[in-house]
Regions:
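Surface-exposed amphipathic alpha-helical segments
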Residues: 1-9, 107-139
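Secretory pathway targeting signatures of secreted, lumenal, and periplasmic proteins
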Residues: 2-54
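Sec/Tat-exported extracytoplasmic proteins
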Residues: 13, 36-38, 49-56, 106, ...
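Extracytoplasmic/secreted envelope proteins and their assembly/folding machinery
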Residues: 19, 42-49, 99-100, 125-132
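Active-site beta-strand termini and strand-to-loop segments that position acidic
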Residues: 22-26, 80, 103-105
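Second-shell loop/turn segments in exported
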Residues: 31-38, 88, 114-122
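Structural recognition of the beta-strand scaffold that forms the well-ordered cores
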Residues: 33, 76-79, 110-113
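Signature of long, low-cysteine stretches enriched in small and polar/charged residues
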Residues: 46-103
Length: 139
């Protein structure tokens, strides 16, 4: 895979659940999006993990996840890899990974999520973390 392609994000239209929406990677299957979610940070971490059939974590394990700055707040860096089941009974995508940040910002749950082929997600993680630090919530 050409590493240079993981750094080119194609802007896609926003959708009902995606405030910002991008595609990345040589395969064309990598996605990055920003959304506001229901529930707690822990609820959303476990939802992401479940999409990869990874075990749920508890509050103590949540505290041990790496911290990342996003929208002037501190979020939790979440990663998993394997067979991605995605939302709403989407077809299983083997060999995929997720990386992202989930934070409580101003009483809302802000998520920045990257999903795609594992090698492409791994290569783009530093770009995603840098992007997280640039996000701001509108007043």
């Amino acid at each position: 895979m050409g590493r240079e392609n993981c750094f080119i994000w194609v802007v896609l239209p926003a959708s009902q659940f995606r405030l910002l929406n991008y595609r990345f990677g040589e395969s064309g299957m990598g996605e990055v999006w920003v959304s506001l979610a229901q529930g707690s940070v822990l609820d959303n971490v476990n939802r992401w993990l479940k999409q990869f059939e990874a075990p749920a974590i508890d509050a103590a394990a949540l505290e041990k996840l790496p911290a990342v700055t996003i929208a002037g707040s501190t979020g939790k860096w979440v990663t998993a890899a394997g067979d991605y089941t995605g939302p709403m009974n989407a077809p299983v995508k083997p060999g995929f990974a997720v990386a992202g940040v989930i934070a409580s910002v101003g009483g809302q749950i802000l998520t920045l999520k990257m999903v795609g082929p594992k090698a492409e997600v791994e290569a783009a993680k530093p770009v995603l973390e840098s992007f997280a630090k640039t996000l701001r919530m509108a007043e």
